[in-house]
């Protein structure tokens, strides 16, 4: 089997807007962020929208959805040995709402807040390549958490990591992009 090294880059952008007599998108049509195919430092549906943070700090699948999504992924892939491949990655992205919603403070998209609202994570992955499909195990860590806007430990977990808060483990079938 030939040795390989590659760099893969992915940009994902989505915008959804309610039309007709609807003022809000149906829940199943809204975007979510975090998880094995998004910003891998967050568990699935636990990121955003924007700077939004649930009052009790828990994940809320209903309010952590949005109308706009941006994913930026950079991955370095290499062969390790046998059927095992490795990856190192950096992910950035978030979701936002197009309107202000009382139950999602800090979630509305603004051009001025685009950079400060981006969540950033990094990590390592192990892939088991069976030729017809790939089993993937990724460990991501938050580097910048937009839900915390002050210069405290939670905003920059890269400097002050908390294992229970800032790491996410993912098992998936297939490549992330």
Positions of predicted regions on the chain:
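Outer-membrane beta-barrel channels and translocator barrels
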Residues: 4, 16, 79-83, 130-133, ...
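C-terminal beta-signal and adjacent terminal beta-strands/loops
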Residues: 92-109, 132, 140-159, 175
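Outer-membrane beta-barrel "beta-signal"
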Residues: 126-133, 163-177
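Transmembrane beta-strands of outer-membrane beta-barrel proteins
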Residues: 5-11, 86-90, 124, 135-137, ...
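Extended hydrophobic/aromatic segments used for targeting, binding, or gating
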Residues: 109-124, 128
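C-terminal outer-membrane beta-barrel translocator/porin domains of Gram-negative envelope proteins
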Residues: 4-78, 88-111, 154
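Transmembrane beta-barrel architecture of outer-membrane proteins
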Residues: 67-71, 119-123, 166-170
């Amino acid at each position: 089997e030939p040795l390989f090294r590659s760099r893969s880059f992915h940009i994902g952008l989505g915008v959804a807007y309610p039309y007709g007599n609807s003022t809000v998108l149906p829940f199943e049509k809204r975007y979510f962020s975090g998880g094995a195919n998004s910003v891998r430092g967050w568990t699935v549906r636990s990121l955003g929208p924007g700077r939004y943070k649930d009052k009790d700090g828990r994940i809320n699948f209903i309010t952590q959805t949005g109308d706009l999504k941006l994913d930026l992924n950079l991955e370095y892939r290499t062969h390790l040995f046998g059927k095992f491949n490795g990856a190192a990655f950096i992910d950035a992205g978030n979701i936002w709402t197009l309107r202000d919603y009382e139950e999602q403070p800090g979630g509305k998209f603004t051009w001025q807040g685009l950079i400060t609202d981006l969540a950033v994570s990094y990590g390592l992955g192990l892939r088991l390549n069976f030729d017809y499909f790939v089993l993937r195990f990724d460990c991501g860590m938050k580097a910048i958490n937009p839900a915390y806007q002050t210069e405290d430990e939670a905003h920059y977990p890269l400097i002050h990591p908390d294992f229970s808060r800032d790491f996410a483990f993912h098992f998936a079938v297939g490549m992330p992009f």
